[in-house]
């Protein structure tokens, strides 16, 4: 009697896992989709079902980081009752916990001698996701305000959130403190500062954040 061969379904997560392992083990990004698929026993049509190129796959990795972060946020039953400031804090804390779990890959892909434009292109979709997340927060806040003059600009706030993430990402990449405790402190101080700026009470937090940056040689 012939033995039935059970085929394992290839998913985007499995392809991403193969890709990240390849990068870490070989310390180089694969250049040929054909060779990559052959080495990992992936049918080319299965690869193209999810990704049109390696560049698209690289963007998808960052999208997964964001999606996994927001999924974890919404699993917390208390999350919806958080203030917008606490939602942003929780988002950054969770995001960087996930990045820490994949730190070797992130450091390699962003620290190699690739052109800056290539690195920014890799983060393009993530930038859109973070800005959309920030827009939702500020629109929730604006909905509770009756005077137009007290409402904040979603566009400005969302761009600020992206700049904040980019700063924290660089800080985290350079952080050598135990458990990346300095990154946690930077998250807390930067989120406090940006929300105080939008509440028009920025002076104390700006001074505090400036002292922190000076101490860490980032000023």
Predicted segments — roles?
Residues 152-171, 185-193:
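Hydrophobic alpha-helical segments that form the core
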Residues 120-144, 155-167:
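Amphipathic alpha-helical packing segments from all-alpha helical-bundle domains
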Residues 2, 10-35, 39-45, 59-63:
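Short, amphipathic alpha-helix enriched in basic
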Residues 75-108, 115:
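Hydrophobic alpha-helical connector segments
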Residues 41-51, 99:
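Short hydrophobic/aromatic patch on the recognition helix
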Residues 12-17, 48-74, 78, 89-93:
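An amphipathic alpha-helix adjacent to DNA-recognition modules
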């Amino acid at each position: 009697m012939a033995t039935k061969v059970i085929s394992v379904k290839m998913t985007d997560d499995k392809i991403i896992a193969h890709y990240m392992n390849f990068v870490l083990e070989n310390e180089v990004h694969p250049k040929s989709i054909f060779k990559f698929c052959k080495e990992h026993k992936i049918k080319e049509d299965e690869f193209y079902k999810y990704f049109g190129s390696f560049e698209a796959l690289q963007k998808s990795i960052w999208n997964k980081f964001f999606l996994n972060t927001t999924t974890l946020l919404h699993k917390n039953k208390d999350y919806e009752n958080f203030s917008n400031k606490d939602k942003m804090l929780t988002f950054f804390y969770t995001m960087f916990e996930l990045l820490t779990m994949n730190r070797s890959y992130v450091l390699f892909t962003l620290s190699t001698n690739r052109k800056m434009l290539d690195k920014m292109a890799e983060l393009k979709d993530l930038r859109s996701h973070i800005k959309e997340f920030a827009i939702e927060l500020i629109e929730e806040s604006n909905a509770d305000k009756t005077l137009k003059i007290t409402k904040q600009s979603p566009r400005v706030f969302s761009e600020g959130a992206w700049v904040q993430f980019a700063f924290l990402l660089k800080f985290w990449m350079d952080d050598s403190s135990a458990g990346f405790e300095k990154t946690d402190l930077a998250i807390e101080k930067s989120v406090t500062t940006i929300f105080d700026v939008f509440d028009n009470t920025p002076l104390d937090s700006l001074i505090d954040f400036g002292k922190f940056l000076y101490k860490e040689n980032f000023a």
